[in-house]
């Protein structure tokens, strides 16, 4: 399966640079998973497609203000550090700009010594493992010194950083937002609950691998980045009960989908668990967890386009994307949404 099969034409003008004033006023393209038939609504109308007994699964990860600007201690040269993943203790996988001159043993100084980062391992593509030294609580230091790490295709400054967080974000650890969840408001979630729909949470901390382009021609040769996930016993019990009663599980975002499918693949049911997943979902994948999913419109030739193609068909998804382009839907993180069901 060639990567070019997941390409599509997207005018740059359709890449949303800012969020809409009201989260749930974004547009919603509803696509039948089997037939590819489409309907065009607004996100707040999504409640029409939920049934009592369904369970909606949200990723409650919180984006860290993980972009730091500092100096190389030895030379005073300016450096930018983007924190990606906590490896263990105070050791983090990071991306550095410029990275070339940062070697093992070099130290970076942020906020006049409030955070010192020491390089302990060099990796490819500008990656490093850095050991952080700081006083107090890391989250407080990041809140003080860091900036929100917006995706590279968003060029405009974000006036309100909370707009790149879901309203239910709780577990800090992501380098990017689970963007399908950005459309929900507290009021809409209350309406959904009042209809008899269950709300469940999982956590998957989104790494920057989400934005890294696939660098191989043959999709089968691609290796996914690993991301940390966890599921509580409460969520596991609710999802198992949903399945046993013949109701539907609808995931919000590809991150929730990857978490749910990882756990069902590894355990044959939902269990309390945590770990790292590099599950790669592309056409031919056998879905065991979800019955529907909400997702944004993704980058051409990305693993996320492959995931949604696997849930329906490549032809259905690319036809929906072509329709969305023609109707001038907004694309990517701050863009509009799809419901595939």
From Swiss-Prot:
Its main location: cytoplasm. Pathway: tRNA modification; tRNA-queuosine biosynthesis. It catalyses: 7-aminomethyl-7-carbaguanosine(34) in tRNA + S-adenosyl-L-methionine = epoxyqueuosine(34) in tRNA + adenine + L-methionine + 2 H(+). Keywords: Cytoplasm, Queuosine biosynthesis, S-adenosyl-L-methionine, Transferase. It is found in: Cytoplasm. Its EC number is 2.4.99.17. It is an enzyme of class 2 (transferase). One of its GO terms (molecular function) is S-adenosylmethionine:tRNA ribosyltransferase-isomerase activity. GO terms for biological process: queuosine biosynthetic process; tRNA wobble guanine modification. Monomer. Transfers and isomerizes the ribose moiety from AdoMet to the 7-aminomethyl group of 7-deazaguanine (preQ1-tRNA) to give epoxyqueuosine (oQ-tRNA). This is S-adenosylmethionine:tRNA ribosyltransferase-isomerase. It comes from Staphylococcus aureus (strain JH9).
């Amino acid at each position: 399966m060639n990567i070019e099969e997941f390409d599509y034409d997207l005018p740059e003008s359709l890449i949303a640079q800012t969020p809409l004033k009201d989260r749930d006023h974004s547009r919603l393209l509803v696509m039948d998973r089997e037939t590819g038939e489409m309907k065009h609504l607004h996100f707040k109308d999504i409640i029409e497609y939920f049934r009592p007994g369904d369970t909606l699964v949200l990723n409650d990860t919180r984006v860290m203000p993980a972009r730091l600007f500092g100096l190389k201690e030895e030379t005073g040269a300016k450096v930018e550090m983007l924190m990606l993943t906590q490896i263990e203790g105070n050791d983090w996988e990071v991306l550095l700009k410029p990275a070339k001159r940062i070697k093992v043993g070099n130290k970076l100084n942020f906020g006049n010594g409030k955070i010192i980062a020491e390089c302990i391992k060099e990796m490819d593509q500008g990656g490093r493992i850095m050991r952080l030294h700081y006083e107090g609580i890391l989250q407080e230091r990041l809140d003080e010194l860091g900036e929100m790490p917006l995706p590279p295709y968003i060029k405009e400054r974000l006036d309100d950083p909370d707009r790149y967080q879901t309203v239910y974000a709780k577990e800090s650890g992501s380098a990017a937002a689970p963007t399908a969840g950005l459309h929900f408001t507290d009021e809409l979630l209350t309406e959904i609950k009042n209809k008899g729909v269950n709300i469940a949470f999982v956590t998957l901390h989104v790494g920057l691998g989400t934005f890294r382009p696939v660098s191989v021609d043959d999709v089968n040769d691609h290796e996914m980045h690993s991301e940390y996930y966890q599921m509580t016993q409460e969520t596991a019990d609710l999802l198992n009960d949903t399945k046993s009663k013949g109701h539907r599980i609808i995931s919000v975002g590809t991150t929730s989908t990857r978490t749910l499918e990882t756990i069902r693949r590894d355990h044959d049911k939902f269990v309390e668990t945590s770990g790292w997943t590099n599950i790669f979902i592309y056409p031919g994948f056998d879905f065991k967890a979800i019955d529907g999913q909400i997702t944004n419109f993704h980058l051409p030739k990305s693993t996320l386009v492959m995931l949604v193609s696997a849930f329906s068909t490549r032809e259905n998804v690319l036809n929906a994307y072509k329709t969305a382009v023609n109707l001038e839907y907004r694309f990517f993180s701050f863009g509009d949404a799809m419901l595939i069901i």
